[in-house]
Regions:
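N-terminal secretory signal peptides and thylakoid transit peptides that target proteins
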Residues: 2-21
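C-terminal segment of N-terminal export signals and the immediately downstream linker at the start
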Residues: 28-65, 69-70
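Repeat-mediated protein-protein interaction surfaces in helical alpha-solenoids
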Residues: 40-44, 74, 78-82, 102-110
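Ankyrin-repeat boundary/"N-cap" motif
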Residues: 52-65, 86-102, 121-128, 149-167
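Ankyrin repeat structural motif
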Residues: 70-78, 108-116, 132-140, 170-171, ...
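Ankyrin-repeat C-terminal turn/loop position
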Residues: 82-83, 119-120, 144-145, 191
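Short domain-boundary/entry signatures in modular proteins, especially
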Residues: 115-125, 193-202
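Peripheral terminal and inter-domain segments
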Residues: 193-289
Length: 289
């Protein structure tokens, strides 16, 4: 019995060795006679999406957007596909924001903690909002100057810590203490409140407000309005946008993006157009309202 088994094993070894030696040079038709019959069969429901194998960009956008305010919808999306907890979206002009970054700058610690539990990658901005004092302090000590880095939408590290006070009534005493320590520490540094931009008075803001067109299409233009923080913001016509920070006479930057500049053509205190420039394009949009 042992001899027979030995004979079978020897034949098996020889056969597989030959395939191993010559397999790379065998024609595809010969290789197909072996165990490759199942390759190429795809099981799916309906048509394969055009974006496959990437996740639908609209879903990614929704996860990031809803992470600002809608925990239940975020759960509905992320519970099914936990990798969405790592979602990142570019709003416009290089303004990148992750789902956890969204929850962090609006002070939604409940959403942030849920996303962390699903595999999201917290940053120093998240830890500042959560009041993780020792973590924030150790990161700044390890990389001095990191406190000056701006978060999504050009929001500062200190403002993230302030945002942590939003849910203070649902925090434990140790959590409240940690948040207070974090805020005090960042205030003491003196440079964690972000870039210093020129002030724009409410009266000055008014002259920039309105719609600007650069083409014949309905969406070929921008709307300048005030955002929730009472700052000038620029977005597609009729839609929300990013903050405009003043850097010079009738000159602004978009959400603090260093390579994006917005300037206005003003004559006799009347605005005629705006020009947006980045490293690749320059667009002139004329004021229509």
């Amino acid at each position: 019995m042992k001899k027979k088994d030995s004979h079978i094993n020897r034949r098996t070894v020889l056969r597989t060795s030959v395939i191993g030696i010559f397999g790379l040079s065998l024609p595809n038709q010969i290789l197909a006679n072996y165990s490759f019959a199942g390759i190429g069969k795809i099981s799916h429901k309906g048509n394969i999406p055009a974006h496959f194998p990437n996740i639908d960009p609209e879903i990614i956008s929704e996860v990031v957007g809803k992470s600002h305010f809608d925990l239940e919808r975020v759960k509905a999306l992320v519970d099914v596909r936990p990798e969405l907890a790592k979602s990142v979206w570019e709003w416009r002009f290089g303004d990148f924001e992750s789902a956890i970054g969204a929850a962090s700058h609006v002070g939604r610690r409940d959403i942030a903690l849920y996303l962390i539990g699903k595999g999201a990658r917290p940053t120093i901005f998240t830890f500042a909002m959560l009041g993780a004092f020792e973590v924030v302090k150790s990161m700044i000590e390890f990389a001095p100057g990191i406190q000056k880095v701006m978060g999504p939408h050009g929001i500062s590290l200190l403002d993230h810590a302030y945002a942590g006070e939003r849910m203070i009534d649902k925090m434990t005493d140790p959590e409240v203490t940690g948040l207070k320590q974090t805020i005090d520490y960042l205030e003491t540094l003196g440079n964690a409140s972000g870039e210093k931009y020129l002030d724009v008075s409410p009266d000055e803001q008014k002259k920039y407000l309105g719609d600007y067109k650069y083409g014949d299409g309905m969406k070929d233009g921008f709307t300048i309005q005030l955002n929730m923080r009472k700052l000038l913001s620029l977005g597609p016509i009729g839609d929300f946008g990013g903050a405009l920070y003043k850097i010079g006479e009738n000159k602004f930057t978009y959400n603090g993006a260093p390579s994006v500049k917005i300037s206005f053509d003003i004559r006799n205190d009347i605005i005629y157009s705006l020009t947006i420039t980045d490293p690749e394009v320059a667009i002139v949009a004329h004021k229509i309202s």
